[in-house]
């Protein structure tokens, strides 16, 4: 061995250091390269979300109502109930709590003062010296792109209903203020792309749901219960790792938390009653956790020994029950509170002990009502104010003087509008720096070859239509009118968009066709009528053909067809259709669907239930039929609507990998309330959750140009609150007696 200066060990050390530095730089460069390919814009639909327009409202109860339950007849009140809007018409705002600032800790109030609320608090105290301390509103808002917890000062001192003049003055003061609501995540470092929901305040601590920690297995909810202290600035996970909890409620003492949990069972895809268990544990650290009762959800503490919750009774009605969480007797059975004849759910207990607030569904509209615990009668509330609007998730103020809820702000009782526009596109917080995410007011978005335009199926028309808009949501134009879905832009002919023409979710024998729509990029802006023509590419009598996707060179289309009696994949000529060329790509007595062809022509991604009937996994296949293999499996769940990145190296898709993010009864109708967007590399590695939502996200499209939230257009449509309530509530029999305010 040759030595240098008689010190070989230093020579070796130098070589090792150089090698380490080289490999580190190489690995870092590779990681940066991999991260760099995850870029552009993913547009997608969130079912109904763009028309929710949720704001939080309260109704002040008359003072004599606090004595309700003394066995007298229905409460009679001479004046009309008044509703106060507590949030300010941005994005969607929901799941609130209203608490007196006198119950908040000094560290919390100091934080709010430092944030800029000091003058507002002092102003209210000066104006209302004899009133109770101002109230704090905790609520969830998506105003910054993801569901986050905010704390704000409501319109009036103590949440009291004021005269129109007084309320107008106060609203002006608040809206002209530069002080935004305080976002809870400001107390901690790191991104906030995940969901925070269902906040409750006790002392200096906020307890809430968060999806920040991934679950340990597919199809398990990421929901966990967390607490953030204003005194210590420390955030703790209270749920055990690997356990999914929903709908937390804090005891009046602040010592205990009760949750609805999937602990001890697997979620099997149910979207109505979840058969959760109610667990109680210490609010300080999650210790002393134990099961209270099986089959319950949405707990609400009335006092230290009474918790109300909902479940589906044996007679089929959603009903409210109560239980003593500290009664250790083995024969304790929950007591049914609300009678059969009306669906009652999402209870909110009052501190009076005489009544509870509940959501009900009697006909087709969800309302908030009061249930008298002694007379066993319902009292109308929101139906008297907005009879044709859905109202969600009631809450009761800490004084029990107000009942709150959230509803679409689109209309006043007199029919006038309270919202300026339902946006056409809206930014969503992305966990990846170079990747933009946007909601689209429609479905099946597809990007033009240069990424500057988006074709999509509009959701605001009486019948579906194909629209085209700019990437920022401006210059919307109607291209094709009729029942369309499953859009795909031609990669070489910028004026051609392929579409599925016909009804959705139909049998293999239904007539559904693939069409090529012309002049998609030059249609008249805001035209009243469609300005493009189309060409049928599939033959008459070939039954159900859907989801076209062009090859990277624009010569061929892959699509799903049921012409054989089973839904499999076929390839045809992109210009002249199957009349010129047709090739069957897959064959079997299963469903292969949602094909997407990579821009480099190498792979076709698709969803298939060939491994588990009715459950869909992600597959890849070469266009010549070779190389078929499964990329990801949700075992036994759903992976649907895959879409390649513009560079063909990654895939985005919708899946139930993260289970549910809320009890489905607490949100509007969703076809699949467990759908979120994920991406991965084409070999299945690098799986990343993109969206965190209690609503269904799906039908993604991926364009090559990123778009900042500040660049998005404010154009949209007139608000009309066009969304449905859940479809799993069925009317069974006659409704029980109810009362109303007069």
Segments (PLM) and residue ranges:
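Sequence signature of WD/YWTD-type beta-propeller architectures
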Residues: 2-742
């Amino acid at each position: 061995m040759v030595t240098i200066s008689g010190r070989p060990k230093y020579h070796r050390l130098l070589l090792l250091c150089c090698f380490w530095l080289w490999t580190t730089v190489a690995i870092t460069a590779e990681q940066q390269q991999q991260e760099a390919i995850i870029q552009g814009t993913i547009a997608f639909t969130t079912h109904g979300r763009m028309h929710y327009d949720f704001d939080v409202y309260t109704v002040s109860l008359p003072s004599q109502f606090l004595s309700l339950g003394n066995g007298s007849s229905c409460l009679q009140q001479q004046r009309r109930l008044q509703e106060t809007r507590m949030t300010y018409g941005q994005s969607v705002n929901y799941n609130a709590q209203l608490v007196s600032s006198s119950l908040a800790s000094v560290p919390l109030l100091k934080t709010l003062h430092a944030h800029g609320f000091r003058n507002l608090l002092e102003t209210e105290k000066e104006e209302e010296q004899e009133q109770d301390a101002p109230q704090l509103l905790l609520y969830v808002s998506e105003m910054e792109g993801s569901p986050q917890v905010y704390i704000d000062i409501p319109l009036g001192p103590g949440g009291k209903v004021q005269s129109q003049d007084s309320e107008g003055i106060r609203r002006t003061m608040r809206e002209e203020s530069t002080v935004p609501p305080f976002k809870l995540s400001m107390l901690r470092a790191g991104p906030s792309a995940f969901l925070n929901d269902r906040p409750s305040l006790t002392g200096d601590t906020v307890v809430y749901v968060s999806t920040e920690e991934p679950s340990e297995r597919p199809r398990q909810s990421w929901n966990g219960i967390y607490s953030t202290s204003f005194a210590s600035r420390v955030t703790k996970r209270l749920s055990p790792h690997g356990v999914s909890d929903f709908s937390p409620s804090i005891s009046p003492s602040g010592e205990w938390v009760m949750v609805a949990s999937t602990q001890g069972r697997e979620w099997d895809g149910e979207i109505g009653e979840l058969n959760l268990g109610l667990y109680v544990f210490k609010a300080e650290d999650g210790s002393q956790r134990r099961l209270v009762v099986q089959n319950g959800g949405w707990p609400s503490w009335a006092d230290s020994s009474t918790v109300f919750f909902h479940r589906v009774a044996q007679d089929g009605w959603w009903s409210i029950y109560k239980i003593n969480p500290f009664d250790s007797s083995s024969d304790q059975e929950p007591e049914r509170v609300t009678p059969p004849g009306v669906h009652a759910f999402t209870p909110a207990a009052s501190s009076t002990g005489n009544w509870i607030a509940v959501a009900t569904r009697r006909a087709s509209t969800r309302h908030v009502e009061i249930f008298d615990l002694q007379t066993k009668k319902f009292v109308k509330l929101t139906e008297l104010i907005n009879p044709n609007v859905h109202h969600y998730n009631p809450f009761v103020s800490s004084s029990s003087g107000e009942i709150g809820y959230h509803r679409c702000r689109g209309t006043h009782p007199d029919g006038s509008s309270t919202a300026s526009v339902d946006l056409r596109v809206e930014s969503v917080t992305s966990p990846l720096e170079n990747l933009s995410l946007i909601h689209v007011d429609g479905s099946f978005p597809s990007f033009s070859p240069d990424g500057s335009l988006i074709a999509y199926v509009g959701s605001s028309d009486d019948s579906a239509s194909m629209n085209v808009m700019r990437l920022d949501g401006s210059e919307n134009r109607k291209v094709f009118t009729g029942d369309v879905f499953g859009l795909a832009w031609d990669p070489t002919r910028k004026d051609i968009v392929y579409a599925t023409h016909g009804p959705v979710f139909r049998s293999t024998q239904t007539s559904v066709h693939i069409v090529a729509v012309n002049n998609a990029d030059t249609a008249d802006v805001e035209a009243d009528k469609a300005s493009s023509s189309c060409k049928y590419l599939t033959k008459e009598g070939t039954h159900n053909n859907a989801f076209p996707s062009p090859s990277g060179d624009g010569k061929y289309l892959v699509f799903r067809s049921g012409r054989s009696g089973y839904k499999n994949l076929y390839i045809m000529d992109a210009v002249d259709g199957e009349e010129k060329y047709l090739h069957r790509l897959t064959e079997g007595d299963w469903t292969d669907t949602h094909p997407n062809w990579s821009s480099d022509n190498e792979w076709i991604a698709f969803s298939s239930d060939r491994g588990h009937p009715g459950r869909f996994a992600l597959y890849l296949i070469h266009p010549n039929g070779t190389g078929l293999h499964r990329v990801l499996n949700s075992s036994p769940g759903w992976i649907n609507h895959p879409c390649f990145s513009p560079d063909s190296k990654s895939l985005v898709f919708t899946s139930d990998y993260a289970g549910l993010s809320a009890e489905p009864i607490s949100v509007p109708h969703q076809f699949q309330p467990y759908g979120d967007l994920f991406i991965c590399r084409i070999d299945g590695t690098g799986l990343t959750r993109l969206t965190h939502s209690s609503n269904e996200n799906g039908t993604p499209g991926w364009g090559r140009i990123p778009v900042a939230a500040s660049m998005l257009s404010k154009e949209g449509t007139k608000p009309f609150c066009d969304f449905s309530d859940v479809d799993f509530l069925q009317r069974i029999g006659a409704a029980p007696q109810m009362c109303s305010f007069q």
